[in-house]
């Protein structure tokens, strides 16, 4: 029987390096994907993921299984990503979002679009829609963006997201409501054409 994340982390706390390797292999890709959606830069997302795992490892002795491991890990990731976004805004105010999405490096990111052997045209339309949705999500205020990404892409429940964002569940629901309303406004042309569902 496979060990739970909590069991693995308790083993890491006890000095088991292989358990840490298992956690790293299990969560590296989802963590990098989440961080990419937050910071919109593959290299920065990779660096932040390494920093998250480094912080998890350094804090192993303080780990207490009072919350799910993923809640703890994504809280660290969210804080690092928000700090990175804030720092980046101050350094690169003149770079537009369009310029950052046109680099070859960013073209390598995974898209959450189902593959049912679509035609080239369907694939292009699907990529365009996904890009429009991600641009709209990226334009949200930081906390709203984090809440939407944790809810829709990481599929965390309200309680977990509230812990990650350090707010009450009712405050989170209000935050998500405002975020989805903002997305509806931003994506209205796509929604009105039945192109996308928010």
Task: Please state what every model-predicted region is.
Residues 2, 91-123:
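Internal acidic/polar
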Residues 11, 40, 93-99, 111, ...:
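C-terminal edge and immediately downstream basic/flexible tail or linker adjoining helix-turn-helix-like DNA-binding
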Residues 13-22, 32-51, 169, 191-198:
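Short, charged helix-capping/linker segments at alpha-helix termini
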Residues 24-42, 59, 137, 182, ...:
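Amphipathic, Lys/Arg- and hydrophobic-enriched alpha-helical face
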Residues 33, 47-54, 67-79:
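Structural recognition of an alpha-helix C-terminal capping motif at a helix-to-coil junction
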Residues 61-65, 75-96, 126, 189:
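Arg/Lys-rich amphipathic alpha helix in sigma70-family domain 2
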Residues 71, 78, 82, 133-136, ...:
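DNA-recognition helix of helix-turn-helix
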């Amino acid at each position: 029987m496979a060990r739970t994340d909590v069991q693995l982390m308790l083993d890491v706390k006890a000095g088991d390096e292989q358990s840490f390797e298992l956690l790293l292999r299990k969560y590296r890709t989802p963590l990098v994907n989440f961080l990419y959606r937050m910071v919109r830069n593959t290299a920065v997302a990779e660096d932040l993921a390494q920093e998250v795992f480094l912080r998890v490892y350094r804090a192993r002795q303080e780990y207490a299984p009072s919350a799910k491991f993923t809640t703890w890990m994504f809280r660290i990731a969210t804080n690092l990503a928000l700090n990175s976004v804030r720092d980046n805004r101050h350094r690169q105010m003149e770079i537009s979002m369009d310029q950052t999405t046109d680099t070859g490096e960013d073209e390598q990111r995974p898209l959450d679009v189902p593959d049912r052997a679509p035609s080239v045209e369907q694939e292009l339309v699907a990529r365009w829609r996904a890009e429009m949705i991600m641009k709209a999500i990226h334009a949200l205020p930081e906390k709203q963006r984090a809440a939407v990404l944790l809810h829709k892409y990481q599929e965390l429940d309200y309680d977990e997201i509230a812990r990650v964002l350090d707010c009450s569940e009712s405050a989170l629901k209000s935050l998500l409501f405002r975020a989805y309303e903002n997305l509806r406004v931003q994506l209205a042309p796509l929604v009105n054409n039945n192109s996308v569902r928010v």
